[in-house]
Every structure is written in structure tokens, then in C-alpha cells.
Amino acid sequence: MTTPSTPRVVIVGAGFAGLFAARELAGQHCDVLLVDRNNYHAFLPLLYQVATAAVESENIAAPVRSVIRAMGAKGRNVDFLLGEARGADFKRRQLTVEVQEDGQKRELHVPFDYLLLAPGSVTNTFGVPGADEHAFSLKSLEEAVRLRNHILRSFEAASRSTVDPEMTPDERLRRLCMVVVGGGPTGVELAGAMAELMSGALRRDFPRLGLTRPCVTLLEAGDGLLPGFPQRLRDYARRKLTSMGVDVRLGAQVERVGPEGAYLKNGDAVLAH
């Protein structure tokens, strides 16, 4: 594919930035290789809708090779490698990529002339004890599906209270409550979507639980939601969430997270499952 006179551009990550770079380089005098551990591109702004069962996961994912094919003739210089980038040797100009074959992992050393890094981001728990073990993050399609399944399993477990004498009322309530930490765009969207899910489909599907209002708490360490947005939008978001039944708590700093919920620095405990 690569000739001595054709530079190779390797792009790590087939997210928005990686695909944008590949499209800009399509048809140019270079060979482009996209590297990603998934063979699909997920539309991350809609992860919260997958997590709350509003849309199916396949509706926000597109195969990377289909995206390349849609580039038409210009995309002939763009290729894709399914694997996970593990490191780069800039002196030798090689990218180490871990691939799987027949269930076995091995490493490839992919040469490059130019390397573009767009691997995305990971959730920062700021060192809060218990967050990694007991909390969910929402950065990938797999995490969104995992959260959705957890919500549904929690409601199924709570519904057993009618036949399970060992389930206490407090345990039943805890399984019906969700806590969202962070009042940015994702947190606001997720809290609102959870409230809609509990007030709508889950209330209809679990009538014996007697849900009268959603049990969703949104914790924000700052003095307002959506920092950086115009004040009128920040105020509207809080009013709207409150009207939907979301318990919005500002200045709420999480000290630790346990299997029973979140514990705040002011001594409060917000129970959830």
C-alpha cells in the first residue's frame, strides 16, 4: 500500500476527531491507516439514550469500514486496522498495536511517517474511594449497555419484594434509586432521561412497585449546573429537572462511593444501587 514516495499517516482512534482527520486526508498524497479497538464508530452524545433504553445501541453505531466506503473514490487511500494501540516508538517511527487472532493476542509494529493521536478520553474519578468499584461511567457503547442492563435488573430485583420476605423496604427503595454525579451536559441529560424512564416505561412495566415519582439524584460539586453555559440555560436546566422529579443538589462533594450509594463530605448519604 505504501510506496517510498507516499507518506503513511497512522491515526489512533476512530471517533469524531480520528474520522474527521481521515476524511480530510482522503484523496491526498498519503496512505492513511485508522487504528481502533472497535470496528465501529459510536455517536457518543447519544450514549445516555442507550443507557436509559430510549434507543438501541445499533442505532448510534456505524461500521468504520462503511464510513470509509462512504468516502467514495477519495477514500481509496484510507484503510482500517482493528486493534488496540499500546505504545509508540518515535525513534523508529513504529506504533505497537495489539491484535487478536483465534483468541490469541499478539503485537504488530506498524510503521508511520506521521502519527495522529485521537484515542478519546476516560472518566476521571478524581481519586474518590470506591468510585471505580461501585460506580458506572458513560464513555463507551459497552458502558451504556452495561448501565441500562443494571437499571433493568435493579427494578426486576425490587419487584421480587412481593414474594421475597427477606427484602426490607429500605433495600427495595435503594434498588429503585439512581445517583448521577456531575452536572455537566452528560449528567444533566442522563438524569433527565432516567427520570423520564422511571416515570414512563418502568412505571408502566412495574405497576406493583407503586412508583409515584422517579428516584433520581443529581450531585454537582459546583454552585450550578452546566458550567460555562449561559446563565439562563443553567437556570432552565435546574428548573426543568426539578419539575421532572430529579433531586438536584449543588455544592455536593462526593467523599466516597460504596455498594449502597454515595457518601458526601457534609455527612449526607445518598442511597442507590
Question: For the regions a protein language model found, what residue spans apply to each?
Answer:
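FAD-binding core/adjacent interface of flavoenzyme oxidoreductases
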Residues: 2-6, 78-177
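A Rossmann-like FAD-binding core segment of flavoenzymes
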Residues: 71-97, 195-273
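Beta1-alpha1 glycine-rich phosphate/pyrophosphate-binding loop at the start
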Residues: 2-82, 178, 185-229
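Short hydrophobic core segments
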Residues: 12, 110-120, 254, 272-273
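Internal, well-ordered alpha-helical segments in soluble enzyme and binding-protein domains
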Residues: 143, 147, 174, 187-190, ...
